[in-house]
Amino acid sequence: MVKVAVVGASGYAGSQLCRIISRHEKLELTGLFVSENSLDKGKKISELYGELNGLCDKVLQPLTGAKDIIDIADAVFLATDHKVSHDIAPALVDAGVAVFDLSGAFRISNTDVFEKAYGFAHEHKDLLKKAVYALAEYVDVKALQNTKMISLPGCYPTASQLALKPLIENGLLDLNYRPSINAVSGVSGAGRKAKLTNSFCEVSLNAYGVFTHRHQPEIAEHLGTEVIFTPHLGDFKRGIHATINAKLKDGVTPEQVAKAYSYYDNKPLVRVKKGMPKLQDVQYLPFCDIGYAMKDNYIVICSCIDNLLKGASAQAVQVLNLYYGFDETQGLI
């Protein structure tokens, strides 16, 4: 059994990790941690999330330092603020703990771009170079298994990259025209902390972070091309629906596009649909559903994920499964 801890367990992604790990036959959940000033410390996780009652009743412990984790875990999920992950990851890696980081602290390799996106300077450049960015369907498993620092993609980047990578890697897009990504996320993507804009009577459908969202440089770096990314907040609980417009090279055929997407034929958590996917088909599930339509030299791709699962906790466990050589769907389906 692999001993696993979760930091940031009281958040939405953290709670989903607790649920998945508790049902995983090869993982033992050894510790749940929150910040020292959290109002949730000392409570059982099941007091916050009734779905965990009887499944995971562990107490949320205040995290005093890396040693709390090192003493009890082979691997840790950091479902934390970016700065928290940035600060604690080096000590964990040095102690031999496998770090699966759900924050953005190690996603962007250019430190100048990182600082502009996240608002603080990256102080661990050596570890940043060693970090493996683990989009599950594309990660180099050998490289993954040779590091202790695993950076997990963001929710929007997961939906966007899974939709576009087959076309880009097969050279089918005319990249003189930037792909345009318009993605709508449920309110859970904004986190559990109460905010006026996320309250029941205030939440609406609106664009935000136009040209400034920190996921834009992440998407661009790992696709290898610039994109136009416009995120939206939707008036629903969970899920992401991304609609992507792109230009195909002259002469690209439907058969070439279909062959490109056949890459996912042996990827159990990506489903390529004949029509356009529906958000309801992936909510509370670990899948990414993709559909597309072509006309002239243009293609519209739609990609749907559950932002808390394929966009966060389920992908994190999927990558852990790959890291330890388990079936990648272990504990997920």
Language-model segments: which ranges?
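N-terminal Rossmann-like NAD(P) cofactor-binding subdomain of oxidoreductases
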Residues: 2-201, 206-208, 294-295, 330-332
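C-terminal active-site/capping subdomain that shapes the small-molecule cofactor and substrate pocket
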Residues: 245-333
